[in-house]
């Protein structure tokens, strides 16, 4: 719940001097990205901007306090201010910030700017007291904000110091409007206006000018002179003499002498107690000060000119001028030290009564009242946890004695979930075990269930499937239906364990149940997680169209609940990319991988490993080895600088091994094979993938026998567990093993089964990636004309993609290759004495790639008759009569040059 006063522009007070010269300068504010008002306290920054803002409708105002250093709180108020300015134009951003479904402040702002793209009118956002921000993450985000905000938007920042917002760059580009303390200082004319409306007796212009010069135009000093003159019934000149030599550092003494000591005891007590409130209204004042009719008291303080500011048009909310408020709080600690805890307790109770638990916690912490803090947390902590107010929760729990936590197991559970959310898995079990051992109260069965559900989540995160399964089942037996969150967690873990153990049908049913429960209780991140798991299971079963439809449902949920910036969104984009890659929709697959990397752009670079592996995979499918190598360099750097789950390493290793296969890098494959772990089982698609990597490396090294043993066992497991996508992949690798070891009949049998299975999976690129060896076999099958219609169509599509992307043979016949070939000692004498032209070498490469005459003509953009002439000439020079002879001749030349064909 947001405090309304923090979003209200200050009310324009009576008897204030209208700063015409500065307002004239600000009239062109919409031409700048940033308007920066900087000066020490008391120079009239807020008053000036409130005068300028009067009458502007498309303007949001955000008044900061120390608590806004929490990123989530800062984001909530900033988006609320924008919504105020735009009439709720940015609904998606508001939903994201309310549910804390954004990856970072920068990514939230990026979403905000997308929504503001169709906002046509000038838009202003005022942030007051920016000097209170000391969180570097917020500074970074606001620099991003300034770089990317719409052209029709102006940010207005008020600060006592120069904020860390990349101001120099804006200044150079003439995108910064600055007003500093020298410009804010009152002129002689403004000082005269000020005294004329504040003093009962007029003051001469010369005297006014001299007073202005004495205090260097400092508005607070002029206000204090006028206040002192009124309170003491003395002249302004007399007050000024007493003020001579006073500056901000000595102001405290002056305020004691000239303000506090000149009000009655009741008012003094009111000022000191109320200063502990960062903002105040009638109810808060009555509870904290004990005075009746708090609103009337506030208005009286305002009338006396005691530095009280209205914060909204209704006049309900007030706050002290920052300079005066800081002074009063210091005096309160001196003069009311004994009463201080009780005052803070009263403030906390009043904030709670108005529904602001975060503000109440601030005062409970200040009071040092562990019992009150405990009670607030017991009633409101889980709501705060669900709204990601994690920093304040952590601070609050740390302030509670361990004995208090032991008496309240739900708070221990909360602390454990905080650790889990920060990936401090080992600490979770340590905390829960210690609590159970030392707890004086008897935990009921439901609480045991809550503990076990969390332990199950930690166990599955840690890869301990058996313990995760045991704990999740125990939790589900212990938990009543009312403990829906823990039941969702335990059910999800149970489904994930079944998935890992290859029990796909059961896992699918459990994940569907998890989705229903999560949707029923609006636990959207678990709903999304369960749909993603369903898609993975369907993919593993070979039902890729059904997996696609699950993903569509997940994308719809992401849009509806504004989950675009959750890291889990990257997981969804990644599995969509994998599916698109399988179907040879490479541009779309690469776009999804890039989107996934964008979602994680504000996290550690290591988090992008899986999407980066997909980028490599797309390049490999295109036959673009240079680009693949470029991505691989980054991928291998990330692998060497992080600790990853075995599944992540397996996916990264997959593209590395394929790259080594394509480039014939046996040394790299051998080194990797010596070091890579060999899993004990292969009962899920994660482990199947790692064993397939091993088999591929063994085939590259010519170790056919151990590779065959691996693949036969993989296929046995895949058939029994119905891992049909893995079976499809395994058959293709087995085909390559048979082909390279000269077992052509067995190779054809494996390929035919793989083609049939692809009718279900839709696989294209898993064939394409095998390159020329696959192309040769498909050409033979197509020429035999014995394939069923679907398989024939797929074979033609695969061959077309291989010819399009895998031009090793075509690329090999470039000028550099031909020059090396002609200088090779074993080159046939016929080629040396009667060399082909460069165009004829190109035609030979395309013939070898399986192109027809018409396709070659289209590729080289020449007439078909010209191609026939080139073919006739190269046949004559090579001494061959038929197309197949030319293909065999090209193959022999490539082998002679060391290319694995």
From Swiss-Prot:
Activated by ATP and maltotriose, which are both required for DNA binding. Monomer in solution. Oligomerizes to an active state in the presence of the positive effectors ATP and maltotriose. GO terms for biological process: positive regulation of carbohydrate metabolic process; positive regulation of DNA-templated transcription. GO terms for molecular function: ATP binding; DNA binding; DNA-binding transcription factor activity. It holds the Pfam family GerE. ATP binds at residues 39-46. This is HTH-type transcriptional regulator MalT. Keywords: Activator, ATP-binding, Carbohydrate metabolism, DNA-binding, Nucleotide-binding, Transcription, Transcription regulation. It comes from the Bacteria. SMART domains: HTH_LUXR (SM00421). Residues 853-872 bind DNA. The gene is malT. InterPro entries: P-loop_NTPase, Sig_transdc_resp-reg_C-effctor, TPR-like_helical_dom_sf, TPR_MalT, Tscrpt_reg_HTH_MalT, Tscrpt_reg_LuxR_C, WH-like_DNA-bd_sf. Positively regulates the transcription of the maltose regulon whose gene products are responsible for uptake and catabolism of malto-oligosaccharides. Specifically binds to the promoter region of its target genes, recognizing a short DNA motif called the MalT box. Residues 829-894 form the HTH luxR-type domain. Belongs to the MalT family.
């Amino acid at each position: 719940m947001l405090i309304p006063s923090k979003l209200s522009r200050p009310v324009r007070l009576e008897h204030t001097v209208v700063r015409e010269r500065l307002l004239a300068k600000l009239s062109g504010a919409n031409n700048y990205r940033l308007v920066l008002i900087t000066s020490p306290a008391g120079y009239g920054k807020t008053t000036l901007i409130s005068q300028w803002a009067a009458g502007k409708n498309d303007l949001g105002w955000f008044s900061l306090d120390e608590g806004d250093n929490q990123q989530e709180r800062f984001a909530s108020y900033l988006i609320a201010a924008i919504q105020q300015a735009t009439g709720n134009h940015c609904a998606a951003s508001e939903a994201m910030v309310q549910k804390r479904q954004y990856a970072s402040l920068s990514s939230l702002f990026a979403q905000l700017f997308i929504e503001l793209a169709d906002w046509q009118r000038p838009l202003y956002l005022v942030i007051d007291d920016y000097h209170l921000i000391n969180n570097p993450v917020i500074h970074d985000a606001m620099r991003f904000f300034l770089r990317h905000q719409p052209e029709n938007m102006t940010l207005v920042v008020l600060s006592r110091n120069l904020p860390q917002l990349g101001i120099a760059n804006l200044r150079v580009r003439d995108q910064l409007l600055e007003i500093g303390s020298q410009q804010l200082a009152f002129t002689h004319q403004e000082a005269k206006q000020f005294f004329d409306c504040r003093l009962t007796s007029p003051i001469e212009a010369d005297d006014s000018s001299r007073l202005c010069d004495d205090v260097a135009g400092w508005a607070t000093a002029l206000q204090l002179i006028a206040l002192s003159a009124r309170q003491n019934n003395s002249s302004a000149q007399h007050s000024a003499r007493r003020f001579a030599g006073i500056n901000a550092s000595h102001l405290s003494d002056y305020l004691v002498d000239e303000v506090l000591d000149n009000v009655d005891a009741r008012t003094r007590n009111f000022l000191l107690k109320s200063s502990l409130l960062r903002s105040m209204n009638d109810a808060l004042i009555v509870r904290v000060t004990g005075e009746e009719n708090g609103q009337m008291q506030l208005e009286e303080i305002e009338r006396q000119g005691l530095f009280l500011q209205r914060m909204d048009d209704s006049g309900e909310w007030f706050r002290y001028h920052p300079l005066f408020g800081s002074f009063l709080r210091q005096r309160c600690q001196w003069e009311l030290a004994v009463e201080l805890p009780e005052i803070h307790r009263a403030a906390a109770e009043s904030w709670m009564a108005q529904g602001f638990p975060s503000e109440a916690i601030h005062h409970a912490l200040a009071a040092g009242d562990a019992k009150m803090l405990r009670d607030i947390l017991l009633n409101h902590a889980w709501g705060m946890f669900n709204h990601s107010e994690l920093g304040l929760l952590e601070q609050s729990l740390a302030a509670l004695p361990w004995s208090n936590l032991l008496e309240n197991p739900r708070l221990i559970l909360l602390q454990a979930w905080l650790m889990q959310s920060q990936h401090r898995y080992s600490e979770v079990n340590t905390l829960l075990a210690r609590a159970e051992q030392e707890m004086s109260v008897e935990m009921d069965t439901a609480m045991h269930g809550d503990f076990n559900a969390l332990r199950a989540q930690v166990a599955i995160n840690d890869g301990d499937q058996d313990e995760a399964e045991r704990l999740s089942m125990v939790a589900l037996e212990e938990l009543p239906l009312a403990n829906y969150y823990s039941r969702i967690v335990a059910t999800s873990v149970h489904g994930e364990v079944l998935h890992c153990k290859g029990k796909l049908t059961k896992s699918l049913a459990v994940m569907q149940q998890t989705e229903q429960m999560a949707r029923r209780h609006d636990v959207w991140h678990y709903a999304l997680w369960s749909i993603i798991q369903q898609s993975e299971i369907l993919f593993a079963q070979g039902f890729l169209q059904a997996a696609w439809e699950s993903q569509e449902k997940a994308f719809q949920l992401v849009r509806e609940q504004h989950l675009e910036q959750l890291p889990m969104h990257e997981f969804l984009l990644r599995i969509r990319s994998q599916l698109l890659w399988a179907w040879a929709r490479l541009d779309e697959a690469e776009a999804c991988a890039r989107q996934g990397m964008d979602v994680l752009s504000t996290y550690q670079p290591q988090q992008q490993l899986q999407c980066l592996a997909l980028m490599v995979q797309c390049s490999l499918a295109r036959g673009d080895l240079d680009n693949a190598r470029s991505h691989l360099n980054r991928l291998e750097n990330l692998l060497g600088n992080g600790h990853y789950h075995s599944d992540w390493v397996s996916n990264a290793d997959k593209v590395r091994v394929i790259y080594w296969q394509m480039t014939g890098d046996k040394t790299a494959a051998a080194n990797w094979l010596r070091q890579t772990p060999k899993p004990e089982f292969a009962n899920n698609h994660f482990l199947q993938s790692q064993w397939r990597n091993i088999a591929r490396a063994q085939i590259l090294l010519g170790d056919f026998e151990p590779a065959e043993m691996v693949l036969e066992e993989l296929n046995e497991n895949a058939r029994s567990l119905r891992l049909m996508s893995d079976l499809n992949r395994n058959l293709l690798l087995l085909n390559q093993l048979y082909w390279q070891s000269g077992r052509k009949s067995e190779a054809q049998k494996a390929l035919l089964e793989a083609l049939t299975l692809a009718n279900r999976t839709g696989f294209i690129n898993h064939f394409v990636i095998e390159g020329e060896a696959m192309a040769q076999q498909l050409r033979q099958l197509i020429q035999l004309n014995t394939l069923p219609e679907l398989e024939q169509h797929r074979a033609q599509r695969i061959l077309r993609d291989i010819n399009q992307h895998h031009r090793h043979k075509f690329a090999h016949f470039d000028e550099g290759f031909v020059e090396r070939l002609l200088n090779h000692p074993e080159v046939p004498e016929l080629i040396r004495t009667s060399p082909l032209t460069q165009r004829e070498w190109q035609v030979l490469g395309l013939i070898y790639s399986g192109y027809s005459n018409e396709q070659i003509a289209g590729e080289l953009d020449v007439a078909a008759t010209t191609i026939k002439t080139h073919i006739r000439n190269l046949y004559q020079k090579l001494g061959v009569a038929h197309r197949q002879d030319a293909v065999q001749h090209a193959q022999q030349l490539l082998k002679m040059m060391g290319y694995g064909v």
